[in-house]
Swiss-Prot record:
Homotetramer. Interacts with PIF1. This is Single-stranded DNA-binding protein RIM1, mitochondrial. GO terms for biological process: DNA replication; mitochondrial DNA replication; mitochondrial genome maintenance; positive regulation of mitochondrial DNA replication. One of its GO terms (molecular function) is single-stranded DNA binding. Its main location: mitochondrion. Residues 19-117 form the SSB domain. This protein binds preferentially and cooperatively to single-stranded DNA (ssDNS). Involved in mitochondrial DNA replication. Stimulates PIF1 helicase activity. Keywords: DNA replication, DNA-binding, Mitochondrion, Transit peptide. It comes from Saccharomyces cerevisiae (strain ATCC 204508 / S288c) (Baker's yeast). Residues 1-17 form a transit peptide. The keyword Mitochondrion applies. It is found in: Mitochondrion. Present with 3060 molecules/cell in log phase SD medium. InterPro entries: NA-bd_OB-fold (IPR012340), Primosome_PriB/ssb (IPR000424), ssDNA-bd (IPR011344).
Length: 135
């Protein structure tokens, strides 16, 4: 009578998966622009302004969104000026300029977004401008 035990195998190493991610907390600094890719897929582009220090320089990041539910959420509910937390995959690409020199660009593809505080409605912003100009 031998009892059979179950064996589980663990590997100390896993398949190597390198990746680059970026987390940004900032304000949406541009209107959303919709595009259609060559294979007829919809995508969205916008920019985020982030100022890490109160007295520091503002950093601008261009974001691309391919996820359809996120595109719908952004275009329906989020306004310019909104404070957002964005997680994006990051990749550098080298390109050649017209003069033959090489340049590098940072590509950020949004994977997740959290709306922290929405921007002002257009009517609210216009109302404040009118109130300020009539004083």
């Amino acid at each position: 009578m031998f009892l059979r035990t179950q064996a589980r195998f663990f590997h100390a190493t896993t398949k190597k998966m390198d990746f680059s991610k970026m987390s940004i907390v900032g304000r949406i600094g541009s209107e959303f622009t919709e595009h259609t890719s060559a294979n007829n897929n919809r995508y969205l582009k916008y920019s985020i302004a982030s100022q890490p220090r109160r007295d520091g320089q503002t950093n601008w990041y261009n974001i691309t969104v391919f996820n359809e539910p996120q595109i719908n959420f952004l275009t329906e509910y989020v306004r310019k000026g909104a404070l957002v937390y964005v997680e994006a995959d990051a990749a550098n690409y080298v390109f050649e300029r017209d003069d033959g020199s090489k340049g590098t660009t940072l590509s950020l593809v949004q994977k997740d977004i959290n709306l922290l505080k929405n921007g002002k409605k257009l009517e609210d912003a216009e109302g404040q401008e009118n109130a300020a100009s009539s004083e």
